[in-house]
Design a protein with these regions (language model features):
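Acidic/polar-rich alpha-helix caps and helix-coil junctions
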Residues: 1-18, 22, 28-191
Length: 191
């Protein structure tokens, strides 16, 4: 029954939507991000709360057998923007620091996403890392890549996470370390 299937999907999307104000803030639509194609293409408007919400459109996958079906449930291992972000991170905090090169790498991805406003030339290391984090959050919605970014950099509190969600606790290895699969434990393959 198509109506039942839609309502099942609808119920799932309601749990994964964000308020318009949060999406607008993330993509800086009152400033440089007004033309960001990620904002326009990765979200669709939903109205689950009175103030309006957006749901990531990458979560919706058609269940037909059409030409797009072969891409259902697939996720790339790495994408070109992620390689640029990794290179920028190395230029910001690695042994071969070059803040100008890091800024250029970030700017190249931003331009490819229709964000043409140049990053401030006076951004220091902390400012560039903050900008890099923002770009990760925009680019990798619902992919889990941001989790590994936070883990790699040792974030102790996840940005935009309320104390209600975290219980005011510090995020540590207990959160970042994923549990071993049951099969690994049962077969004694853990080393």
């Amino acid at each position: 029954n198509l109506n039942r299937e839609y309502s099942e999907q609808d119920r799932q999307y309601r749990t994964l939507c964000i308020k318009n104000s949060v999406a607008d803030d993330l993509f800086e639509i009152k400033g440089a991000g007004i033309s960001d194609c990620r904002y326009k293409q990765l979200y669709h408007n939903t109205n689950y709360w009175p103030e309006g919400t957006k749901t990531p459109s990458k979560l919706y996958q058609q269940t037909s057998t059409g030409a797009d079906y072969r891409h259902k449930d697939l996720m790339p291992l790495i994408r070109l923007p992620e390689m640029y972000y990794i290179a920028a991170e190395c230029r910001i905090s690695g042994p071969d620091k070059d803040l100008g090169e890091a800024r250029s790498l970030l700017q190249e991805v931003r331009k490819a996403r229709a964000v043409y406003e140049e990053l401030d030339a006076d951004l220091d290391e902390a400012g560039l890392m903050a900008q890099l984090e923002k770009e990760y959050r925009k680019e990798f919605i619902c992919e889990g890549v941001v989790f590994y970014f936070y883990k790699r950099l040792g974030y102790e509190k996840l940005p935009r996470q309320s104390d209600v969600m975290s219980g005011s606790k510090v995020i540590d290895d207990a959160v970042y370390m994923l549990p071993y699969p049951d099969f690994e434990i049962q077969s004694g393959r853990i080393q």
